[in-house]
C-alpha cells in the first residue's frame, strides 16, 4: 500500500501513527480487512519507563491526529452507521485521559463533599459508577488474556498494577491529546528494540530524557496529592473509596519514581545493543 498508485493509499507523513491512518484510508477506498486471530506479530514494550511513556504519547497523539484528519470523511462515507460509530469511539477514545486527569484533580473536593452526604447516597451513586467502570476495564483485559494464554487466570493478579499504570499515564497522555487537537507538531521518535526477554536485561544509557524531569515531578506531585487524599478518606471513614485512591497513588508513585531513578539504575546493568 505504501507504493500504491492511488494518492489516497500512499504513505502520508501528517500523523505519528501512519499505520492507523493508512488502514482507515484503505477501508474508505473500499479495501476490506480480514482479522486472523491465529496469526501473531511479535512486539516489544520499551524496557525504559520514559521510553514507554514516549511510545504511549506517540500512539495517543497519532490517534487524535487521525481523528482530526479522517472522522468527517468517515461520516460522509457509505459505511454502515454502526461502523462510523465504532470508528468514532476508536479514534476519540484517548480523550478519556483528559477526563481521568480532571477526575484525579477533583478527588479532594469530591471527598469533602462526600463527607456531608449519607452512606445511602454513596451506595446509590458511587458504588454502581465505580463498579461498572472497573468491571468494563477488567473485563476487556481479562478477555484479551484468555484469548492469548491457556493459563490466563494467572494474569489476574497483575490487573491492579495494570490499572494503576494506566491511571498514571493520564498526565503524559493528556499532553499528547492536547498537542494532537491543537496541531502542535513533534518529530517521530522511534522506540529502540533490545530483544529483552527477562528482567536482568535493561539498557545502560537512558534514551529518553526530554521533558522527563517535568513529567516525573508532576507524577510525584500527584502521588503526594493522593497520599493526602487517602489519609482524608480514612480519617473521614470513606472506606469505599480507598481501593480507588490506592490505585492512583500506586500508579503515580511507581511511574514518578521510576522515571526519576531509572537512569541511575540502568548504569548498574549491562547494556544490550538496540536491534
Give names to the regions the model predicted.
Residues 1-159, 163-173, 267, 274-275:
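Non-transmembrane catalytic domains and loops of membrane-associated enzymes and transporters
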Residues 71, 107-117, 179-182, 186, ...:
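Juxtamembrane transmembrane-helix termini
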Residues 101, 168-189:
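Transmembrane alpha-helix/helix-exit interface in multi-pass inner-membrane proteins
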Residues 163-177, 200-206, 256-264, 275:
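Cytosolic juxtamembrane regulatory segments of multi-pass membrane proteins
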Residues 76-99, 195-227:
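Loop-to-transmembrane boundary segments
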Residues 158, 185-203:
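Juxtamembrane inter-helical linkers in multi-pass membrane proteins
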Residues 139, 143, 211-272:
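Alpha-helical transmembrane segments and their immediate juxtamembrane interface regions
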Residues 56, 60-63, 67-69, 128-133, ...:
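Repeat-unit-sized solenoid/scaffold elements
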